[in-house]
Amino acid sequence: MALEKTRGRRISVGETAVVVGAGRSGLAAARLLCREGAQVRLLDSNADAFSGREALAGELRQLGISIELGPHKPDQFENAAFVVPSPGMPVARLAGLVDEERAEILAEMELAWRYLENEPVLAVTGTSGKTTTASLAAAMLHEQGYAVFLGGNIGTPLSEYVLSGHKADVLVLEISSFQLQTCSTFCPRAGILLNITPNHLDYHKDMAEYTEAKFRLFRCQDEGDLAVLGESLRSLAARYGLKARQVYVSDAGRFSGSSLMGAHNRVNEEAAWQACRLFGVSEENAARALARFAPLPHRLERVRELEGVLFVNDSKCTTVSSLKVALEAFDRPVRLVCGGKFKGGDLAGLADLVKNRVSAVALFGAGREHFERAWQGLVPMTWHASLEPAVKHLAASACRGDVVLMAPATSSFDLYANYEERGKDFKRIVGKLS
């Protein structure tokens, strides 16, 4: 039986707390700290952060929250006891601004964790598969009859749950490396680490720091807790001296009837199931939940089949490693749409996979030179200024049995606000094909 978890200190009435970033998690953290009697300063480097949200700004000021917009200055952090950075803000940017001997820098999730009433937590991290696995775990727990909160890095911040006053039986939380880096006492009853491949190296100084952040998920666990890890992490985990009971999962495939494509989803399913077993979820209920589970948008999402050609939206594919996973999910010829703001990675390492599985590549937007340099001579490639002509080009010459797959292997920020917008555009384009 796991012992009651030790939590970090809570803010004291009258102490100063600085929240950096006026996004959803920052607003939730500011409200929680305000509720606890702190003097709250809400900072955002974007001078237009509340443009069109004037009523919200007025509401926050009514609560006593001070809002300061524009470049951050050291005096904004004076006398701070807590500093809660935006999940997307590298902690290194606070150097020279925060007196770390006086102020504690902590993630919004760490802050909210300190105000929970001992609800058990199932937390999921990894370079890829986090959202699907967290959603699967929530579905399995729900099938068993639990009242479940699903949130964290997916949807609702944990601070919003704390403020709501609701009480769930189990909290299922997706958590990123950004959040984990400033978690000090956060401790899930069951923690899942699916995989680690190069990502977010514009945020973390190197791969070692990124890996260290991911393994912080387990640092406060004890022998009564559970650590579920992808089989590929077995040797790496040995370096970290995990105290929790460990289970390693592979793509062997326990369940039948899943609508999720790809061997990587067998890993996601097994990881969710192993974590849910700790809460008494039966294999039968897990299987029922999985049979009803619909693929999440933009993750190897079947859009439509037109005259025997399958169109698949994998806009969430933003890295080279996730492109590899996407290509391995199909045993039929793939006509690949990719391109965008390249984040780095070894595209040349996919040469054999591209040569054997991809019949044509349509590049769009930025980053074309990376793909052309890595795959020149392996497969016919064309470049298009935007997504629509790229999709239409591949669709026009596709044969029955082909897959037209959008798996960009890049971020979307050259042409779109986010990967969701890019995926929606792909679905719009495909929906108009005839």
From Swiss-Prot:
Keyword Cell cycle: yes
GO molecular function: ATP binding; UDP-N-acetylmuramoylalanine-D-glutamate ligase activity
Gene3D superfamilies membership: Mur ligase, C-terminal domain, Mur-like, catalytic domain, NAD(P)-binding Rossmann-like Domain
Catalyzed reaction equations: UDP-N-acetyl-alpha-D-muramoyl-L-alanine + D-glutamate + ATP = UDP-N-acetyl-alpha-D-muramoyl-L-alanyl-D-glutamate + ADP + phosphate + H(+)
Pathway: Cell wall biogenesis; peptidoglycan biosynthesis
Keyword Signal tagged: no
Pfam families recorded: Mur_ligase_C (PF02875), Mur_ligase_M (PF08245), MurD-like_N (PF21799), NAD_binding_8 (PF13450)
UniProt: ATP binding residues: 126-132
GO biological process annotation, one example: peptidoglycan biosynthetic process
Enzyme Commission (EC) number: 6.3.2.9
CC terms in the record's Gene Ontology section: cytoplasm
Keywords: ATP-binding, Cell cycle, Cell division, Cell shape, Cell wall biogenesis/degradation, Cytoplasm, Ligase, Nucleotide-binding, Peptidoglycan synthesis
Predominant location: cytoplasm
Annotated localization: Cytoplasm
Family: Belongs to the MurCDEF family.
Listed HAMAP family: MurD
Function text: Cell wall formation. Catalyzes the addition of glutamate to the nucleotide precursor UDP-N-acetylmuramoyl-L-alanine (UMA).
Protein name from the UniProt record: UDP-N-acetylmuramoylalanine--D-glutamate ligase
Source organism of the structure: Desulfovibrio desulfuricans (strain ATCC 27774 / DSM 6949 / MB)
